Amino acid sequence: MARPTRKTGPKKAKKNVPSGVAHIQSTFNNTIVTISDIRGDVISWASAGSSGFKGAKKGTPYAAQTAADSAARRAMEQGMRQLEVMVSGPGAGRETAIRALQGAGLEITLIRDVTPIPHNGCRPPKRRRV
């Protein structure tokens, strides 16, 4: 019996996007880097977990650097040259991710911290007792 041929979906066309926005969400447990165009359509993304790190190693600066480098390379294949960077969260990989984006060859035009800070909003969870 002959094998059924696989149907492949339409190939994603390469966009030519010269500038965009990189969102770096850095928590204590992971770092997620998302690169989008100016309208907000995602061009590439990577996280410490998707870069092959597991468990507590996902929260390290090196894992954030690897994730940012991976996302930057994929964005540069789409023609990305300039970036605005929005950094969010208290994690260890904030600065290393920005340096990795610069090191990959992207020109950073703006760095903005968009970490949400409550103006006395919800009651925080109770303190941990270890």
From Swiss-Prot:
One Gene Ontology molecular-function label: structural constituent of ribosome
GO cellular component: cytosolic small ribosomal subunit
Source organism, top-level taxon: Bacteria
Alphabetical UniProt keywords: Ribonucleoprotein, Ribosomal protein, RNA-binding, rRNA-binding
Keyword set includes rRNA-binding: yes
Keyword Transcription listed: no
Any one GO biological process: translation
Pfam families documented for this protein: Ribosomal_S11
Xref: SUPFAM superfamilies: Translational machinery components
Matches recorded under InterPro entries: Ribosomal_uS11, Ribosomal_uS11_bac-type, Ribosomal_uS11_CS, Ribosomal_uS11_sf
Coiled coil: none
General function of this protein: Located on the platform of the 30S subunit, it bridges several disparate RNA helices of the 16S rRNA. Forms part of the Shine-Dalgarno cleft in the 70S ribosome.
Quaternary data: Part of the 30S ribosomal subunit. Interacts with proteins S7 and S18. Binds to IF-3.
Family, as annotated: Belongs to the universal ribosomal protein uS11 family.
The protein's name: Small ribosomal subunit protein uS11
